[in-house]
Structures are given as C-alpha cells and as structure tokens.
Amino acid sequence: MKKIAVDAMGGDYAPQAIVEGVNQALSDFSDIEVQLYGDEAKIKPYLTATERVSIIHTDEKIDSDDEPTRAIRNKKNASMVLAAKAVKDGEADAVLSAGNTGALLAAGFFIVGRIKNIDRPGLMSTLPTVDGKGFDMLDLGANAENTAQHLHQYAVLGSFYAKNVRGIAQPRVGLLNNGTESSKGDPLRKETYELLAADESLNFIGNVEGRDLMNGVADVVVADGFTGNAVLKSIEGTAMGIMGLLKTAITGGGLRAKLGALLLKDSLSGLKKQLNYSDVGGAVLFGVKAPVVKTHGSSDAKAVYSTIRQIRTMLETDVVAQTAREFSGE
C-alpha cells in the first residue's frame, strides 16, 4: 500500500479542492492510502471516502506570506510540517501540498532530507509542448544560485525521472542558454556545457533556447533556479494571455466570431487542455529522500487528483530509491 501524506490546508481552495481530489484518487486507485493533515472540522464536510483515509487533526497551518524557514521551525504542528515528519518517520511514503512553496522546499530539505551526494535538490515540473508530450525542467526555483556541478546533477536527475516515470528510453537533455552554439553563454553555462557533453550516460543534445521549449526540442531542460523560475512564470503567463486574448476576441467579435468559436470548439478545448497544468501533476523536489510534490496554489480537485496519480507512479517505479542508489554508487 502506497501511503501519501497530504497537507489538506495548503492552497487557495483548501481544504475543499484538496479533499475532493483525494476522494477521486481513492476511488480510482485501490493501492493508495491517504493521510489528511489539517483541521478535522473543516475537512470532514468534503470527505466522502470511507476507506484507506485518515485525518490527523491540527489547528496550525503555514500561510502563504509566512517566511519559509522560520515557519518550518516555529510552526511545528502545522499541517505541512506534520505531513513532512510523517515521511521522515516512515509513516508515509510521500508528501503533497498546494501551500507555501518556500516552506515546502524547506520541509523537504530540513525534515525529509537530501539524498547522499546530491548537493542541491532541484524543483522539477513537466511543462506543456505543442505535441502534448511535455518536457521536464529543473531547477524551477529551489535555488537562486547554482554551480555547474549542480546543473550537471540536475541533468542526471531529470534524465532519470524522464526514463523511470515518463517512460522515455533515451531522454534528450538540453541546457537552457541564449543561443544553440556551444560557445554561447556566461561562464556558468559554458562550464556546464562541458560537463554535460563529457557525461556519456546522458543523451545531451546541446544548448536550447527558450523560444523552442514548447516545440519539444528536448525531453529534459536544465537551468539554474533563478532562470528556470523566470521561464516557468513566462510560460504560465503566456498561456493565460493566449487564452485571455482568444476569449476577448470571441466575446467581442460579434456573431461571426461566436459562430467560428462554435465550429472550433473541439480544437479550442484541446488547446486549453494542452496548456492546463491540471492534467500534468505537480512540481517535484527531486533529490530528497522521498517524493515531495508541490501542486499549484490555485489547484482544483482535478489538479490534486493528477498530482496524486503522479506520486503513485513515482512510488510504483521506486524512482527515488533508484536515484539514491545511482548517486551513492551502490
């Protein structure tokens, strides 16, 4: 049985969206057990599942504006902290939260703990591409500064995840840069390029540019945390902007525009689905001793369900244990 500790109080629509996503996951997956951490009185009205689920009550939670490290240290009974401790103590196999990203990263670093020989765990997510296959990108903001050695580790981690969780036999690894030529970039990018090119275990395809990411130029894209986070926000903003422009054009374009939208209904729905994070799952703090997964703060029940499905696959493939063995040299 795969045991998942869930912070029921994190996110914009908690606990309703969290619990409703859990209900659906428990209905579809008979091999998972969920521990809900949070205010029992607020959780119970939404909980319809009766088997393989438990509520661990706490009145304390971490708010979105709390300073991450201080919150982890001072709010020892917060729902997120208790969920992370359950993983550390072996009472759960993975932790999920839609709450404060920085606090969850701190919980991953300081409570769950790093895998031996991994210097800086990275935040990774599967982002959309036009062909629907997606690409894994890290670091998306777990670390503001990185060395070339960190980025090399991210390439290995991302490639490992793409192989074992997404089923890609030879993941193409690209280094995000300001040009595709091997001579491009600052000293960090140039040093990283040399490390990746020399690692024969990687299917390194060279530098990739931001404009090509959504065309599926690579299966794994490596970036420092500052750049990766900026690119992630740009992709999210662009996707929302495109959908907003389409909506404005349709609603303000008169009868012809509305008829055109009706004829293109299926195509527009497909586009929306491709750009929607709800089907993809959450961002994984990869490089810690158990799956620590952050779903979007504005996640609905569908996104929570997708993230639980993602965690289930990670546990099923034992990707974290395999990663630990890979880096420890066992």
Curated annotation (Swiss-Prot):
> According to its UniProt record, which reaction does this protein catalyse?
a fatty acyl-[ACP] + phosphate = an acyl phosphate + holo-[ACP]
Listed pathway(s): Lipid metabolism; phospholipid metabolism
Q: Name one GO molecular function term.
A: phosphate:acyl-[acyl carrier protein] acyltransferase activity
As recorded in UniProt, coiled-coil segments are none
Which is one Pfam family of this protein?
FA_synthesis
Q: Might you give the EC number(s) for this enzyme?
A: 2.3.1.274
Q: Which Gene3D superfamilies match?
A: Isopropylmalate Dehydrogenase
Q: Name one GO cellular component term.
A: cytoplasm
At the top of the EC hierarchy, this enzyme's class is transferase
Checking SUPFAM superfamilies in the record gives: Isocitrate/Isopropylmalate dehydrogenase-like
Taxonomic superkingdom = Bacteria
Keyword match Lipid metabolism: yes
Keywords, sorted A to Z: Cytoplasm, Lipid biosynthesis, Lipid metabolism, Phospholipid biosynthesis, Phospholipid metabolism, Transferase
Listed GO biological process terms: fatty acid biosynthetic process; phospholipid biosynthetic process
Compartments where located: Cytoplasm
Complex formation: Homodimer. Probably interacts with PlsY.
Function, in words: Catalyzes the reversible formation of acyl-phosphate (acyl-PO(4)) from acyl-[acyl-carrier-protein] (acyl-ACP). This enzyme utilizes acyl-ACP as fatty acyl donor, but not acyl-CoA.
Please give the family membership noted in the entry. Answer: Belongs to the PlsX family.
Q: What is the protein name given in its UniProt record?
A: Phosphate acyltransferase
